[in-house]
Amino acid sequence: MSVLDLARAELRGIRPYVPGAYEPGMIRLNANESPWRSPGDTSDRGLNVYPPPRPTVLQVKLAEYYGIEQKQILVTRGSSEAIDVLIRGFCAAGKDKILICPPTFDMYRLYASIQNAGIVRVPLLAARDFALDVDDILKALDANTKIVFVCSPNNPTGQSMARPDIERICRETAGRALVVIDEAYHEYATGGHYLDLRNRYEHVVLLRTLSKFVSLAGVRCGLIVGAPQLIEFAQVVLPPYTFPTPSIELVEQALSQDSLRVSEERVATIKRERERLAAALRDVPQVMKVFPSDANFIMVKTRDGQAFRETARRAGILVRTFEDPLLADCVRITIGRPTDNDQLLRAVAGVERASNA
């Protein structure tokens, strides 16, 4: 069975859009573009011409960086667009479903709702630091469950999922559903990644992003990593020309050796600060528990989440609370610069001293 047998039947025969030919050095009179640059255009390639249908130069660089083949990569506008592309490609509206494990990244639910796809929820096991409930995940699958989303490290709880659990899900869903492993935070993890699974299981897809690691959240660059035939199919769903020229050039710069060296040093700093902040928060009376984290944030259980959030806000710091009952009084704290983290700790400690005076 091919992974494409899981895709929407009505999309399988559609051919991708074929753009006009582009040859460097040739005069472009075949694409109805302006022959002049816009005033203030300082880009290398020129913003008066369309970007390439696919940012091939980035696919080459990313494939080299991750040690995979170019045909296994599709660049998207952030990993959120990748989620949308996969749901639209595999879930027929009003018929098919996705499976998610809340509390988790809410974009899975949002894009499924927009597509009118069903949503099966198998909650993480809160008593086990939000581990996957693999038995219930497998029991919940039926013929219309087309995608299983697993976020590792998980947002917003922060922990990496146990590799044996993920491998079991991949093994037992073969031929039944696509497994999408969202690795948006994998650079901050200590337990490795799941790139090796793409060759062992045709139905396994990985999501990556450059928003965190190389500090390009404003550029919106994500990618789908999967079997070549799945990537070819996803290109039917993703329109051409979606990745802008300025974004291509910024990502190229970020993937240079010098820039990557800086990014890797910053990741090391975040990891050190994560441990320091976690240790300090354990001594704060408001904090009941600091959850283990493999991401660039920490989640804590507090006595009063709203009060903790307002304490931080009065000190000029924004932290995140959640409406999900599973996360009652939990607060997600992004790891900032050392001075940012110090400011948060001073604010929380100061309020505690005042309340205990």
Language model region names:
Residues 1-64:
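N-terminal "arm"/small-domain region of PLP-dependent enzymes with the aminotransferase-like
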Residues 55-97, 115, 302:
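Phosphate-binding glycine-rich loop
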Residues 113, 131-144, 156-216:
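Active-site pre-lysine segment of PLP-dependent enzymes
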Residues 164, 311-315, 320, 324-357:
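PLP-dependent enzyme catalytic core of the Aspartate aminotransferase-like
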Residues 203-283, 289-290:
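PLP-dependent aminotransferase class I/II
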Residues 270-271, 281-315, 331:
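Conserved PLP-binding catalytic core of the aspartate aminotransferase-like
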